[in-house]
Amino acid sequence: MTDAQQHRSILARVGEVLLIVGVLDIGVMIYCIMKGISYVSSFNIFAVWLGILLMRGSLWAASVVRFFSAFFLASGIGLIAIFPFLQPISLTLAEVRHISPFTVVLPLLLLPLSFWTARELNREPVLGALQASGKSVSPLVFPVLLGFGLVAAVGGVVAFT
């Protein structure tokens, strides 16, 4: 398989997964609305749109998804690490009793998805295609630091106010 075929198959595979996850997220959102359950997600329509673009071989979409996958992974891990320090544990336990399981489970499932997506889009055939198209390919250090930095900044503001 040539590099062109390899990068297109990687983009298609990642696109299919994002499309499926986006459609499932939209389905969960509709279910929660119909049942009056609280549910917040802004992942759904973007996952569908970027999934379709990736399936069509868009290197722009690959670059965007690569960046935001690393950002979401870092900020998600950072949030899990800092969350116990943001409010008393008794308040957290009281809130857990009244939230939908979707509110906890789906964000936790997005962490491994973000890891897998960033890893797939950071493979050599994709990076080579991005470079060949003239797009700058930077290491994922910046989105990772940005994700951790955002969580640290918000956590600092919440903790000291």
Sequence positions of predicted segments:
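Topology signature of small-to-medium multi-pass alpha-helical membrane proteins
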Residues: 1-161
